[in-house]
Amino acid sequence: MDKEELTAWALANGWQIIAGWPSLTKPRAPKEAIVRMVFKATVVNLEVKKPAGKWEKVSGEAYGKVVADPETGRPSGLGFDSIPSFSMLMQDNKDRLMMERLNGGRKG
């Protein structure tokens, strides 16, 4: 998957662009990114924001090695399957964004 494919997947799965990167937010603070995908020239990194505010890389992979799962479409190689909290956070973000859209842009 390339940068555009990863971005399209992320936006369809509850991520939003914050400060130029596809990001997941805290459920209670929907404007503050706590997980982000950072695109470099040849690799994509998954970073998590530490409580002190510093970003820490938790995984990374060359674009050529990131492949969409044939059943779920989820990118492999970035740790989404090995860290269950990412799935829950993505679902929380996706649900919140859907509720905002249903409410005409207002927070649920």
Question: Model segments located where?
Answer:
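Negatively charged, low-complexity tracts enriched in Asp/Glu with abundant Ser/Thr
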Residues: 1-30, 105
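Intrinsically disordered, low-complexity regulatory regions enriched in serine/threonine/proline
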Residues: 2, 28, 34, 41-108
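Short beta-strand micro-motifs enriched in acidic
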Residues: 18, 38-40
